[in-house]
Amino acid sequence: MEGEIVMTRGIDHIGMTVPSIEEATAFFQEAFGAEVSYDVQRPEQEPMAGDEVEKQLGLPEGTSIIHMRLLRIGDGPTLELFELGTEPDKEPLRISDIGIHHFAFYVDNIEQASERFEAAGGSLLSPPHSLDDEEDGPHNAGVYGKTPWGSLVELIKYPDGVDYPKGSEAPRWTPPKN
């Protein structure tokens, strides 16, 4: 269409493969107050599998998807969970691996969020710590943790803002306070 400007509105969802959608849903509900939007693929349905699905999703031959669920967590992108009917290829990515290796939850009270994360079955890699450089501020903090199945997530807060360097093209998106 001539003259039409195509604009990206933002990140719609983030996909994550988990060993059990029911267990992952319970974890995200307990840790972050997640709400179920809907199931794309339900366990009672025929698994998503075959050449067409493998091609569309870039899956290895023989991989099947038995359950897909969308979760809403606060005012951010939807989290899309995948449960395979076959064994996953490998362990979750780490920061030292190429590819999407973590996502962060903006929290208002990092101590309380850390406790809730651990009570839900997650494990923190360290205690919450101050942020550095442009993100430094007396009340700004972050901490990384692992979900019960080993995926890396971050809890972060920067109520003192970010000191954007000269030439910064855009402020980072921050979920609005409810």
What are these regions (language model features)?
Residues R9-H13, I98-H102, N140:
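Short, solvent-exposed beta-strand edge segments and adjacent coil->beta transition regions
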Residues T8, L70-R72, K146:
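Short, low-complexity cationic-aromatic patches
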Residues E44, T86, P159-V162:
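A short acidic/small-residue loop/turn micro-motif
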Residues L71, L81-E83:
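Helix-adjacent hinge/juxtasegments
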Residues E2-V6, M16, D39, L79, ...:
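Vicinal oxygen chelate
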Residues T17-D75, Q112-A113, A119, D136, ...:
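Core segments of cupin and vicinal oxygen chelate
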Residues E54-K55, S64-I65, L84-D89, G99:
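Short acidic (Asp/Glu) patches
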